[in-house]
Amino acid sequence: MEVNKKQLADIFGASIRTIQNWQEQGMPVLRGGGKGNEVLYDSAAVIKWYAERDAEIENEKLRREVEELRQASEADLQPGTIEYERHRLTRAQADAQELKNARDSAEVVETAFCTFVLSRIAGEIASILDGLPLSVQRRFPELENRHVDFLKRDIIKAMNKAAALDELIPGLLSEYIEQSG
């Protein structure tokens, strides 16, 4: 939705000056600006920018907290003390936020999602392969049955591999982690 500076300020409950400051900080402008031209914004793009900016600010705060705690020297922290527990909590929060950001930006995805997608694609491929011998037989009627049967056998092997993909992924993931780690 296109909005002007005043409408955007109302949406965020902020002043027009704040909107101007955000614009200087990189908030996306749809069009306009310059001498005498009203600036228009795409509200969805601005909300996305604001959320990303807010997450970056929060990450920076957590990073600073972690760094302050590290400077306090991890060796000096005694298990069971408030400082030690605060250090563990802050580090866990920072790690969780970084993982969430990586997931939100699609830098990482869950294994279950990959298994789901690959299994669905494998099923579609198996369906196409299943009709291939009949298509070849119709297209080339001069082929003997032994040729078509040979084709069917190899296609069945490929279909079985595709069908077992969802069972193979966890093992392949473990193998990948072992080799890359």
UniProtKB/Swiss-Prot annotation:
One of its GO terms (biological process) is viral DNA genome packaging. Residues 52-109 form a coiled coil. Disulfide bonds: none annotated. It holds the Pfam family Phage_Nu1. It comes from the Viruses. Residues 1-29 are annotated as: Winged helix-turn-helix (wHTH). GO terms for molecular function: ATP binding; ATP hydrolysis activity; sequence-specific DNA binding, bending. It is found in: Host cytoplasm. Residues 110-140 are annotated as: Self-assembly. The small subunit is responsible for the binding to multiple recognition elements within the packaging initiation site cos. The terminase lies at a unique vertex of the procapsid and is composed of two subunits, a small terminase subunit involved in viral DNA recognition (binding to packaging sequence cos), and a large terminase subunit possessing endonucleolytic and ATPase activities (DNA maturation and packaging). The terminase binds, cooperatively with the host factor IHFA/IHFB, to the cos site at the junction of adjacent viral genomes in the concatemeric DNA. Homodimer. Heterotrimer of two small and one large terminase subunits. The catalytically competent terminase is composed of a tetramer of heterotrimers. The tetramer forms a ring structure large enough to encircle duplex DNA. Host IHFA/IHFB induces bending of viral DNA to facilitate the assembly of the terminase tetramer of heterotrimers. Interacts (via C-terminus) with the terminase large subunit (via N-terminus). This is Terminase small subunit. The gene is Nu1.
